[in-house]
UniProtKB/Swiss-Prot annotation:
Primary localization: cytoplasm
Database matches in InterPro entries: Thioredoxin-like_sf, Thioredoxin_CS, Thioredoxin_domain
The organism's place on the tree of life at top rank: Eukaryota
Compartment(s): Cytoplasm
Site residues (Contributes to redox potential value), renumbered to this chain: G38, P39
PROSITE patterns assigned to the protein according to its UniProt record, in alphabetical order: THIOREDOXIN_1, THIOREDOXIN_2
UniProt organism field: Chlamydomonas reinhardtii
Family note: Belongs to the thioredoxin family. Plant H-type subfamily.
GO CC, one annotated term: cytoplasm
Gene (UniProt): TRXH
Function: Participates in various redox reactions through the reversible oxidation of the active center dithiol to a disulfide. The H form is known to activate a number of cytosolic enzymes.
Name the record gives this protein: Thioredoxin H-type
Length: 113
């Protein structure tokens, strides 16, 4: 089964994915992004690749902070890109910025745990 990044388009979709991650005991990695954010566009292909590499082990979500502002505000997003890791419905880790090495390490750390 190939991986894929799930685009969150509503608070309800966000809540459903957090519940799914909790139910399946899978970590969720979220990319908080914006269409106008250059660094976000640069790291997006890596995020997509990681979703394939960790298919079945990790749930990958993408949240456009302008399209789903309520989710971004609730998550306390102040800069893009910001990556959050959720485990059992609770934020477990985060990364601010478009560092490819740090993003790879973040996903690997939580996929193995």
């Amino acid at each position: 089964m190939g991986g894929s990044v799930i685009v969150i388009d509503s608070k309800a979709a966000w809540d459903a994915q957090l519940a799914k991650g909790k139910e399946e005991h899978k970590p969720i990695v979220v990319d908080f992004t914006a269409t106008w954010c250059g660094p976000c566009k640069m790291i997006a292909p890596l995020f997509e690749t990681l979703s394939n590499d960790y298919a079945g082990k990790v749930i990958f979500l993408k949240v456009d902070v302008d399209a789903v502002a309520a989710v971004a505000e609730a998550a306390g997003i102040t800069a893009m890109p910001t990556f959050h890791v959720y485990k059992d419905g609770v934020k477990a880790d985060d990364l601010v910025g478009a560092s490819q090495d740090k993003l790879k390490a973040l996903v690997a750390k939580h996929a193995a745990a």
